[in-house]
């Protein structure tokens, strides 16, 4: 009997142990792949609400001096009371998390309320996910869904104007279905809603994927439903938990959910709608409804019960900007109105490829080698995330190669580094320039493989020993090698170096490195003279030659046309940056000039603009930065510095500035005719019909101003905010490009420049620039193409008050242009007042400017030439019409000429002018 009892006890213990093991394994399996990081937490802990284990972030950032405590008002619902502040001058700081390649993940950053001025960006790898900005006293969460491209991923915080910060970072595996239509994209969460939810948030362990379902309040027009449901088969791996689905909204006729404040650029959105029929008495066909997204029907006759289950879900995609409207409308013949339990909205962002994997692994290996002897080195601490993309690492420069970036330059000079030169530097196969000078490196110089692409190596001013490796001297592409001021190195390589063509200091400490200008001065002068001479000859020939234009719309006939010569030889001043006189004004003087800011003439992103008069009687526009300005000191300094260095007839000159008592003021000449926007479709008091020749002249003037910026000596300038409101008109209607607060110097060859501050205005913004964040002059070209369409059509670039198909000027106009129906887009105010060839030149240029890929867009210099040709055609046609008028002919502005070619002045043939509509030539 005793033995039997013992056996029972043993079996009971074994059963308990097995149950415990199964429970532990089940719990472990449920959280497999979870990464939960509590930034600056005192220690690892278990969250009492979710029972998830959170670890501190000290394995990434051990410095506790940058830890801050979350404001007390926000502590009630938090387990981690701290956050990490990254006090950095520039760049990014990243958390590298382990992943499984090709697994889909959710990644979520939590950012505590800091201040109304919060503004910085976050990214997944090299793909910008969004901006952290908050004006409400609450936490902000940014969440993205992505497919892991490798076995780890970077989540980065990128500094803009303020130091970035973060309190929590969470990584969760997700089902594959989330990316079924966007396998190569990152999906940014816009909204995840538990309709009529009772609890604030539903997440893990109720939701095994730890999605956070936000409860929404019940709209006054809708009816809430709530039932305790069980034994429901929920098919689909993206299905919400049953606790979310047991509440719903319904209405006898329609449900509508409007999301405003979305980004104004076109993005694809994925909308996931979840339905669970809560009325057990309903049968299939009794609750049928149509589903619309932004008034576009996506599902017709949708019936939750049609498949025999009470549960159903659907995934819908749509392109939208600014807002997204989900509407469910009762179908004809249905007994009951629509129902919805929960939904998600995700924005699809293009995945930006990271640095070449080989280069990435090598430089990360090199960083680890350097850190062994340089634990607190400032340069190495700043090396975080991707070395090339979204703020390249200090000392690193990259170039594009086969769709990804490769490291071509490594400059760690004067970085206070010690220890041996990392051997991994020899594994950087695309490296061309290596500069490790002015450090404390010791030991031997590593050997480089003959396949190395190095063209310049500088190892001078270190503590290196031994002999210069033969492998370096014999590198096939090397043309400069400096290793002087290494007192322990042997200098017996002079003979070998003499036999090569390498520029070198021969290892001597007193040898001066030849400057590029000194070495190549004669060659540069000679080559430059030849190139300039050739350029002038070619330019003269191209501008003076007779152009043969094929007019496809007129039977394919060819008409020779003599093109006027419009060019000027560059003066010597054009090759040097001029110092323009910009006068500093006192605040007292500004207040006197504006009569205490009496006359307000405009408002902009920088602030208010007032009219004033200087002592000499010159009328001026005074731009005063407001306290709520979206632009700051950086934009003020940017415009001041730029306009102090440039001057051109078609750029608004800066007369002076004031920077006193926290006031930032810029002073310009007053432009009496306002802006191009005012004249085309501005306020009625400012609006005035511009005839076609005047519009063409304005377009040409603005193009010349932009071309001057793009060909600026030394380094071209990109405006970044080209639009009709930034093209001002003086008393003679001369166009002047204005507002240089966002302007930047163009990236030079070899730079790996990415601007997270994607600047511009909705309707004008280059989509390629926005998606890739790669800035170039062609971004201005795209915006100028929109301006040309404004000039032709008299319409604004975006107007959501028009029918949906006409919201975007570009998307509305393109089909008409491609169908050769340009008359359909021409401003009614100028119809009949233009020459067909001149108009087509402008329209064709606009279409080329609006090419989706910047490679296919023309440069501003080419645009200037095309517009010059168009103006010549228009002016010559006008002169011809004047001669007709003098003979008693018809008014030129009531007709359209039926030929784009100009009649010869010596021709005695009868005039071919007609008042009938003409067939326009096909766009080239």
UniProtKB/Swiss-Prot annotation:
Residues 595-872 form the Protein kinase domain. Belongs to the protein kinase superfamily. Ser/Thr protein kinase family. ATP binds at residues 601-609, 623. Involved in the perception of symbiotic fungi and bacteria and required for the calcium spiking. Part of the perception/transduction system leading to nodulation or mycorrhizal infection. The chain crosses the membrane at residues 520-540. GO terms for biological process: nodulation. It comes from the Eukaryota. Residues 1-29 form the signal peptide. The keyword Cell inner membrane does not apply. The active site is at residue 721. Its EC number is 2.7.11.1. Pfam families: LRR_1, LRRNT_2, Malectin_like, PK_Tyr_Ser-Thr. LRR repeats lie at residues 406-428, 430-452, 453-475, 477-498. GO terms for molecular function: ATP binding; protein serine kinase activity; protein serine/threonine kinase activity. It is an enzyme of class 2 (transferase). May be phosphorylated. It is a single-pass membrane protein. InterPro entries: Kinase-like_dom_sf, Leu-rich_rpt, LRR_dom_sf, LRR_N_plant-typ, Malectin-like_Carb-bd_dom, Prot_kinase_dom, Protein_kinase_ATP_BS, Ser-Thr/Tyr_kinase_cat_dom. Keywords: ATP-binding, Coiled coil, Kinase, Leucine-rich repeat, Membrane, Nodulation, Nucleotide-binding, Repeat, Serine/threonine-protein kinase, Signal, Transferase, Transmembrane, Transmembrane helix. Residues 361-382 form a coiled coil. This is Nodulation receptor kinase. It catalyses: L-seryl-[protein] + ATP = O-phospho-L-seryl-[protein] + ADP + H(+); L-threonyl-[protein] + ATP = O-phospho-L-threonyl-[protein] + ADP + H(+). GO terms for cellular component: membrane. Its main location: membrane. It is found in: Membrane.
